[in-house]
A protein has these predicted regions:
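C-terminal region of N-terminal signal peptides and the immediate post-cleavage residues
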Residues: 18-40
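C-terminal PAP-associated
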Residues: 33-635
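Compositionally biased non-globular segments, especially hydrophobic aliphatic-rich helices
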Residues: 11, 17, 24-28, 225, ...
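Bacterial N-terminal signal peptides that target proteins for export
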Residues: 1-13
Length: 635
């Protein structure tokens, strides 16, 4: 039987650090109450941000901040440079921040990147950017094929107030969850989630939010239209906190002969007060100026035998997250996502499933969901990392240490083979896979009764459990996939070296090259002592036959230490790469730069300010999160 889990509040990306005290509608006749951490269900607590759990759960930021006695003077100004072939994308020097606010005013993470199909020299990268203190949608652009970069500014300080009570302006406090794509005429588009925090963090009760799309016309990402055009907006000026909009991703129809050429699609999750979490979609046929009314994508299927609610108003597939839209040359829109409504076989079985639906009428209607494949989520962090990051999944390193505690999840991406418009590739992470299963000591062990997180034997044992990126393929336009009936333990994985077969790969990205080569990149612990220290690298691999992978390349010039900003709990939620011709451009959040603080006793009368390095909450020395890229062969 299915191990019943409450509906998860999978608040990710920018929401990790900006929602503050969200609120839900309460029972009829009761007044609205702040929706704090202690009112979340255990499974909801597992899926909200680690930083949010610290703030609302009582631990506070200062409790885990670097001790000032551990700080040591340094002479570096915090202006990182290229690291060999690894090119720095964001162009700022490091802001000094108080140890209690480590990460705020500094970090960049959660990357997306896309290249101009008309000119491969033009590349735009989006990321969460905390330089101003709170999160915002950061953007950098290159007109040299990724060899040099400049920062631009997303003009998202306020949006029209028409949907928020009619005032001329609605000033948003935070934003993030970036995705960037180009149309076939050289326009770039940037999707950004924007919101207000509410009274739990500020004196303003407003918890309004919305998704907005910005367009860059004629400047290749150097400038963007103002104000952002709304996709969907939620008026919550009163702070009722009745539902949450989360995790939007975008696709632009790039089929030159498509009946929906240049149509823009956004998909997202709506966490509603009735306990549901449906995937929704909206589209624009006028270059992002206006968007259609939302359409529910994740409707009903016998695959969803365990609905999260008794009413499930739009179908039994009511517990979802991590949607990704993509298009075919004939104009078909596909949406793939993670679903948590599947039945399980009992015992320790804790698998979930990836579903897909398609639209042939420009996003107006969708087919019933079909199964892409099963997957197993990353393990419960607290169970294996000394209680750290409770109610979250993470990527534990092997052995006795507990440095790798940042929130992580497995998610799907999809794309259509340019050589065969009915051939679809979907990649997603799975903790159980052909190299990590019962045969080598990694056995699913149900879920934690405390947090609802997934449990396994062998999580901290070298050579036993490790995450991998698996591939499921459809040859008939999404009607069926190789993973629909096959065990995840038999599917191809994007890692083919001996080191990768016994180490973790996570936070992956994927795209097809023009010649039909599938290119997959990921964070990778196959190098040096990464698997036992919690360090990581970036790797890229390719598949020419959609059955096996090779041509594995280590992209990073040295390993990246466990991230320490936001107390080691937030490293973003996803990663992407672009492919131009036979060149792949992965863009990632990098932790090799040392974080800096004001030295104790300086900045006082008679003692000029000096900068110091210091210990992080989970690793020493504390480090920054910056954006890097590289250009590597995709052939």
């Amino acid at each position: 039987m299915r191990i019943r889990r409450p509906l998860t509040l999978l608040v990710i990306g920018a929401l990790f650090l900006v929602l503050g005290a969200a609120q839900f509608a309460v029972s009829p006749g009761a007044s609205a109450q702040p929706f704090g951490f202690n009112k979340l269900t255990p499974n909801q607590q597992r899926h909200v941000s680690g930083l949010l759990s610290l703030e609302l759960g009582g631990a506070g930021l200062k409790a885990a901040a670097p001790a000032r006695t551990s700080l040591s003077p340094v002479t570096s100004p915090g202006c990182s440079v290229n690291l060999g072939s690894n090119i720095k994308v964001n162009q700022n020097c490091l802001n000094l921040t108080d140890p209690a606010l480590n990460g705020r005013g500094q970090a960049q993470n959660e990357t997306w990147v896309s290249a101009d199909p008309l000119n491969s020299q033009n590349i735009v990268a989006g990321y969460n950017d905390y330089r101003r203190g709170d999160g915002t949608c950061g953007v950098s652009y290159s007109t040299t094929g990724g060899q040099t970069w400049a920062d631009a500014t997303m003009p998202n300080g306020f949006v029209s107030g028409a949907a928020y009570g009619g005032a001329p302006r609605e000033y948003m406090q935070g934003s993030g969850d970036p995705s960037v794509e180009w149309d076939t005429r050289g326009n770039a588009y940037y999707a950004c989630q924007e919101f207000k925090r509410g009274s739990g963090v500020t004196e303003d009760a407003d918890q309004s939010s919305g998704f907005y799309v910005y367009r860059s016309t004629g400047t290749n990402g150097a400038s963007w239209n103002f104000t952002g055009r709304p996709v969907v907006e939620h008026n919550d000026v009163a702070g009722a906190g009745d539902f949450l909009l989360d995790k939007q991703l975008m696709a632009v129809d790039d089929g030159m002969n498509s009946p929906f050429r240049d149509r823009i699609y956004l998909t997202w999750t709506t966490f509603a007060a009735d306990g549901t979490a449906y995937i929704n979609e909206a589209s624009s046929a006028d270059y992002g100026e206006h968007f259609s009314a939302p359409v529910v994508v994740s409707t009903d299927s016998n695959l969803c035998a365990n609905p999260a609610t008794s009413t499930h108003p739009d179908g039994r597939c009511d517990n979802n997250q991590f949607s990704d839209p993509f298009t075919a040359p004939d104009g078909t829109l596909y949406v793939v996502w993670a679903n948590y409504n599947n039945a399980t076989s009992g015992g320790g079985d804790n698998h979930s499933q990836v579903l897909l639906a398609k639209s042939t009428d420009g996003g107006a209607t969708f087919s019933a969901p079909v199964k892409v494949g099963d997957f197993n989520e990353l393990p419960d962090c607290a169970a294996y990392q000394g209680g750290a990051d409770a109610f979250r999944a993470c990527v534990p390193e092997k052995g006795a240490t507990a440095a790798s505690i940042f929130r992580a999840s497995n998610y799907p991406y999809g794309a259509v083979d340019p050589r065969s418009p009915r051939t679809l590739a979907v990649t997603y992470g799975s903790y159980i896979n052909r190299n990590s299963n019962e045969a080598n000591g990694c056995t699913p062990a149900g879920v934690s009764t405390t947090t609802g997180g997934d449990l396994y034997t062998g999580v901290k044992t070298e050579g036993a459990c490790h995450n991998a990126i698996v591939l499921s393929v459809s040859k008939n336009g999404g009607a069926a996939f190789t993973g629909s009936s096959k065990d995840v333990r038999t599917l191809p994985v994007a890692e083919s070296t001996a080191g990768q077969r016994t180490s973790d790969q996570y936070f992956h990205g994927m795209r097809f090259a023009p010649d039909g080569t599938l290119v997959v990149g990921s964070f990778d612990r196959a190098y040096g002592t990464d698997e036992t220290t919690g360090f990581s690298d970036i790797s890229v691999s390719t598949s020419e036959n959609l059955a096996s992978f090779g041509h594995v390349q280590r992209v990073t010039t040295s390993s990246m230490p466990p991230e320490t900003q936001f107390n080691g709990l937030f490293y973003g939620d996803y990663f992407q790469l672009a492919v131009t011709g036979d060149i792949a451009h992965p863009v990632w959040s990098d932790t090799r730069a040392t974080d800096l603080f004001l030295c104790p006793g300086t900045g006082t009368v008679g003692h000029p300010p000096q900068t110091c390095a210091g210990a992080g909450a989970n690793f020493s020395p504390a480090n920054d999160e910056e954006i890097y890229t590289a250009s590597v062969s995709a052939g």
